[in-house]
Design a protein with these regions (language model features):
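Structural/interface elements that position substrates and couple domains in central-metabolism enzymes
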Residues: 1-406
């Protein structure tokens, strides 16, 4: 297993490819974006993550990491491509596996006997089996029969902002379509993983990752629902949670403006889609968290004058990252702009607004926003906002969705 082909060079694929390369494996990273390929081959990065630039530079300079837009033969193929969902007209969500299918079909003609094929992308139960089917379908078109192919699902469990640490130190699950596939995957990840690696079947591994994120989503929904109750009853939710958590067996999370990111805001829907009648609590939690941005928008509109200036602090889905995927903050800004308010967006981790906000909001500095706004909305508790105090916001209306400004 000396050569690897990693398909998808985003937040998961790039760190994974790079760490394998620095451990002596020959890695080809594949991405459909020529700009991403050019950036990585020059030893630079296109995403923000602490110390990732150092890792990628070392991997490229070692000669072990190269990037391309097309796959090449390898001992191991790792799929780390997006798995979003499609929203139907009736509001139902169904998994979109088109990126996984395209990636699998792209390398299928290159496989040889004994190759290991790993799905890292968080996926609905049964996706690893579908990858096997897509590969076999492409081989059939070529009248090729390749024996001994091994398939496994090895979901990532890393947190943006701490990816490189958690990539090494977090336990891993390797679920194979066969025990031999799981064992081979374990041997591969032992290259850099210092934690325990647990073996299981592919379907259990797929559901385990979805379960982890659904569990977190349900707990966040409880906190968010508490915040709605407290707003109605005139209670400080932050004080309430602080006191309730003094109970030795209570650990309530903190509420926020919603839930974002490509994991927690997406993965529970895969369970709901697979078992809609059984996943009632999981569905309700998703609905609670998805509704929270609308509550924040209503609060801001009630506080602002008609056509007033509103400063929205933070666009990322969580603190201290540049990842805007599924961000409730972006959704809130879009709704406020649509309502006719002048929105000043402050996001220290990006240089340009996402396409959905261009022409609808203005990206400004924190000082600029505070000087101009009548309403200040804290959406993300970035370190850059940690020094803000109520005294600095005197004369302005504050909506603090994070309970961070005191």
């Amino acid at each position: 297993m000396n050569s690897l082909c990693v398909l998808g060079l985003g937040y998961i694929g790039l760190p994974t490819a790079s760490i394998f390369a620095t451990k002596g494996r020959r890695v080809l990273g594949v991405d459909i974006s020529p700009a991403v390929v050019e950036t990585i081959n020059s030893g630079r990065i296109h995403i923000q993550e602490p110390d990732l630039d150092v890792l990628v530079r070392a991997a490229v300079q070692s000669g072990n990491l190269k990037a391309a837009t097309k796959p090449a033969p390898a001992d191991v193929f790792i799929l780390a491509v997006p798995t979003p969902f499609i929203i139907a007209a009736d509001g139902s969500r169904t998994p979109d596996l088109s990126f996984v299918e395209a990636a699998a079909r792209s390398f299928a003609p290159l496989v040889e006997a004994g190759n290991l094929i790993i799905l890292e992308s968080t996926s609905p139960v049964g996706t690893t089996e579908k990858v096997k089917g897509w590969v076999e379908d492409e081989l059939a078109k070529l009248n090729r029969q390749v024996d001994g192919l091994l398939y496994a699902h090895c979901p990532e469990r890393i947190l943006p902002g701490q990816m490189l640490k958690e990539l090494v130190s977090n336990d891993r699950i390797c679920g194979g379509l066969t025990p031999a596939a799981a064992a081979r995957a374990r041997d591969l990840y032992a290259t850099f993983c210092t934690a325990q690696i647990f073996l299981t079947d592919a379907r259990t591994a797929e559901l385990a990752k979805l379960t982890e994120n659904a569990y977190r989503d349900v707990n966040i929904a409880f906190a968010n629902e508490l915040s709605l109750i407290c707003d109605k009853l005139g209670v400080d939710v932050w004080e309430l949670i602080r006191l309730a958590n003094r109970h030795p067996r209570v650990k309530i999370l903190q509420p926020g403006p919603g839930v974002g990111g490509h994991c927690i805001a997406v993965d529970p829907w895969f369970i709901v889609d697979a078992a809609p009648q059984e996943a009632r609590l999981i569905r309700t939690a998703r609905e609670v968290n998805d509704s929270k941005p609308h509550h924040v928008v209503a609060q801001v509109r009630a506080a602002a004058s008609e056509g007033g200036v509103v400063a929205c602090l933070g666009l990322a889905f969580k603190a201290n990252v540049d990842d805007l995927r599924e961000s409730p903050a972006v959704e809130i800004v879009a709704h406020l702009a649509k309502a006719g308010l002048k929105v000043l967006a402050v996001e220290p981790h990006v240089r340009v607004l996402p396409e959905s906000l261009q022409g609808r909001a203005e990206l400004v500095s924190l000082d600029n926003a505070l000087a101009r706004a009548e309403v200040v909305v804290l959406l993300v508790d970035h370190r850059a906002f940690a020094s803000l105090t109520l005294a600095q916001l005197a004369g302005k209306k504050l909506i603090d969705t994070r309970g961070a400004i005191r």
